[in-house]
Amino acid sequence: MSYIDAVEKTEVPKPSKFYTEPLFEEVTGCPIAYRRKGSGEAVVLFHGAGFTRMWIPFYEMMSEAVDFIAPEQPGFGETPMPNWFRSFNDLVILYDQFFEQLGLDKIHLVGFSMGGWAAAEFASYFPRRLKSLSLITPVGLRLEDNPGVDIFQLTPPELFDRLFKDKEVMNEFLVDPDNFDEGIHLYSEFSAAARLMWAPRYNLALEHRLQRVECPTLVVGAEEDRLIPNEMSDKFAEVLPNGKLVRLDGTGHEPLLERPKELTAALLDNIKGAS
């Protein structure tokens, strides 16, 4: 059996830690899995290229203050990959309809890593939908002098080593590497990420389109990020008209997992300032 056949025949596994059952909203024939908890201002998170299917402590902290919504994009978590899905353009249009069906007019949008790229693309297309924008260790802009690491060239151990500063935190959130179903699922998610980011690993037009985004914007960098150079968060903050840069100490590329309290405080400060 090939990997592709295995992916198609393997049910989505449920992680032993932090798993919660999702809700589903069918959008243009694609059932979008999402988790939602809390009340108040609507805050939507676009996830990165991993750690799906979980309601992690950071999500719980956010839900204590806002209406926190965490969808899983096509090919990730429990959202299937439609045959027609190919680009960030497809994702942006899908999410716009998703928000429409949930009755969300204006939102606070948060994007992490690959999801930061997606959030930036969404903001550039639909700036009037946003009350605020927060980008956490985002990717998607071109850095000529320091392009960073190509994640598709790394082995899984090399990738996880670069994602985290704190290896105890890494071990807490990693799925069982010996679980066959988990291995197949992670392969399928990496393939979904490749559809969006294989080549090029940036959008030359994005930094120009971001000039349309006038809402309060927070860019969160990580002082010890060994996956994405700090120049990336610097550049996002520079090109966004109302961009503000905060860089968290003591964390690698995954501040959601390594510094959830500090990250929550920074995000809520930006959200409350725009509400």
Please tell me what each predicted stretch does.
Residues 27, 69-110, 265:
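Active-site loop/oxyanion-hole signature of alpha/beta-hydrolase fold enzymes
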Residues 28-78:
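Conserved HGGG/HGGXW glycine-rich cap/lid loop of the alpha/beta-hydrolase fold
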Residues 58, 215, 229-238:
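Short alpha-helix in the alpha/beta-hydrolase fold that links the catalytic acid
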Residues 107, 111-116, 222:
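Conserved alpha/beta-hydrolase "nucleophile elbow" surrounding the catalytic nucleophile
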Residues 117-125, 130-162:
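Flexible "cap/lid" loop of the alpha/beta hydrolase fold
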Residues 144-150, 156-214:
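Conserved alpha/beta-hydrolase catalytic His-Asp/Glu region
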Residues 213, 219-221, 225:
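Short beta-strand/loop motif that positions the catalytic acidic residue
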Residues 243-275:
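Catalytic active-site module of serine/aspartate enzymes centered on a nucleophile-bearing elbow/loop
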